[in-house]
A protein has these predicted regions:
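Structural preference for solvent-exposed beta-strand-turn elements
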Residues: 15-177
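Single conserved hydrophobic/aromatic residue that forms the stacking wall/gate
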Residues: 1-14
Length: 177
């Protein structure tokens, strides 16, 4: 799930002492733009449009383990997707989904680096483009429940499409029907 795509020694980070006034990087990730756009698009489907809880307008980027996960939750629907990328420094940050999505979609087709400092300011870099956006702590984010996968049903894609095709006539054309 996590791959390096030949970045190898270019991104190996040596521990450096941080001078007074400088911020250290607490998370650093590298993605291919296409993988990032696809994953952000999936996560955006569960981002709340209007809410009294600002954290629900965010996508949680969790690179605290060996995989990178994007999670969004509107308290009715939750989505967690695993993103292909390289973890250079582990960390967690919640970013405003709308701003993050707009930035990612407009970046050049190249490698994208996402870095977050100790103040949760996140820098998104791709070629000459560089954006700084404020992040939020992932502690306030509403995590999805862990589901037991022992009770599952598997059907083929063809069967599912056929079931939908045979029943789609019964849905209402609008809310009033």
């Amino acid at each position: 799930l996590v791959r390096s795509r030949g970045l190898g020694d270019v991104y190996k980070r040596q521990h450096q002492t941080v001078r007074k006034g400088e911020l250290s990087t607490i998370m650093k990730l590298v993605f291919d733009k296409a993988d990032l756009v696809k994953s952000v698009g999936i996560a955006m489907k569960a981002v709340s449009g209007k809410t009294t809880m600002p954290i629900l307008e965010c996508i949680l980027i969790d690179a605290s383990s060996n995989v990178i996960k994007f999670t969004s939750n509107d308290m009715e629907l939750g989505i967690e997707t695993i993103v292909t990328g390289m973890i250079l420094e582990r960390g967690i940050v919640a970013l405003d989904a709308k701003i993050f999505s707009e930035i990612v979609r407009k970046l050049p087709d190249n490698q994208v680096t996402i870095e977050t400092d100790e103040n949760l300011v996140t820098t998104i870099t791709c070629e000459k483009a560089k954006f700084n956006i404020p992040g939020q702590s992932g502690e306030d984010f509403s995590y999805l429940p862990i589901l037991e996968t022992s009770d599952c049903v598997s059907i083929s894609q063809f069967t599912l499409k056929e079931l939908i095709r045979q029943t789609i006539f019964s849905i209402a054309a609008n809310e009033n029907n």
